Design a protein with these regions (language model features):
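Catalytic strand-loop segment that frames the active site of acyl-thioester-processing enzymes
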Residues: 1-56
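Short, intrinsically disordered, mixed-charge
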Residues: 32-35, 72-76, 140
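Ser/Thr-centric signal marking residues that sit
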Residues: 23, 63, 137
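A generic structural signal for short beta-strands and their flanking turns/coil linkers
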Residues: 12-14, 18, 26, 79-83, ...
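HotDog/MaoC-like acyl-thioester-processing domains
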Residues: 1-13, 91-156
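Hydrophobic beta-strand-centered segment that forms part of the acyl-chain substrate-binding groove
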Residues: 48-104
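Residue-level structural signal for beta-strand termini and adjacent loop
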Residues: 19, 68, 150-151
């Protein structure tokens, strides 16, 4: 998909299913890829008996990574200028996750958006067009598990 400034308006929403029925195997695979073997994520006995959680749970960065993958698919490779957020609830094995990206501003001339470091035409200097997005990932019950913002370069 190619995002164009002329096709976007505030409030326009894009939705993407990230995962259905997240498995413990996927969580452990992420632990291996990231090197984060915290037993809260990988050891059921530790998570339940020692830490008092109902189960192991996914790494926050796994959730952000899946959200970022969908975001990059939406805005196109090489177009993401900034992406950040916070983890608002745990993600459990068996969860279904859906990301929603909502346009909050379109800057046809580079506008006030741009990268978090002020780059990518962030001062309305006639740079590339950008779009600002509110990012929200929820589980199957509608509970928000990640909330953030992103800015991407787009076509005029």
């Amino acid at each position: 998909m190619t995002l164009r400034a002329s096709d976007l308006k505030d409030g326009l929403t894009f939705t993407e299913v990230l995962v259905e029925d997240l498995t413990r195997t996927q969580i452990v695979q992420y632990a291996g890829a990231s090197g984060d073997y915290n037993p809260l994520h990988t050891d059921e006995v530790f998570a339940t008996k020692v830490a008092g959680y109902p189960s192991v749970f996914a790494h926050g960065m796994l959730t952000m990574g899946m959200t970022g993958r969908a975001l990059t698919a939406l805005v196109g490779d090489g177009n993401l200028r900034s992406f950040g957020g916070r983890f608002t609830s745990q993600v459990w094995p068996g969860d279904d996750l859906t990301a929603t990206f909502t346009v909050t501003a379109v800057h046809a001339d580079g506008g006030a958006g741009g990268g978090a470091d002020g780059g990518a035409g962030g001062d309305g200097d006639g740079g590339e067009p950008t779009v600002d997005l509110a990012v929200r990932t929820t589980n199957q019950d509608g509970v928000e598990v990640f909330s953030g913002t992103a800015t991407a370069g787009i076509e005029a």
